[in-house]
Every structure is written in C-alpha cells, then in structure tokens.
UniProtKB/Swiss-Prot annotation:
This is UPF0435 protein Sca_1453. It comes from the Bacteria. Belongs to the UPF0435 family. The lineage of its organism: Bacteria, Bacillati, Bacillota, Bacilli, Bacillales.
Amino acid sequence: MASNNKEMIEEIRKQLNVVNVQLIDPDKFEDADEEKVKEIHSFVTSKDNFSPSEVTAIASELGELRQS
C-alpha cells in the first residue's frame, strides 16, 4: 500500500488507466490533504472498473486537491 501522497496518486493514475499521465502529476499533490488523498485512493483501489461519471468525479476531486 502507498505510504505518501505521491505514491497514492501514482496508484490512482494507474488504476484509472489515465492516457495523458501529465493530467494527474504526482508532484502536484505532495502538500495536498493526505486524508482526502487516502479517501480517494481507498475508493479507487477498491474497484476494478469505473463509469465515465465516476472518473469525472474523481478527476474533479483530484483537481481541487492539486497545487497550482
């Protein structure tokens, strides 16, 4: 299991099968709220498949956590 934000974001990106990996850059999440990243990570790693609306919601949540 991932131990920090960067590792969790990398696992989320892999699980979501992101084509453009730069859209979810782990380096942009180093100082993000770790509890929120853990919540998203737990949800994503608990499922094998995602609906388009789930992917959109996850991306939106990650966008709110990302540093600019």
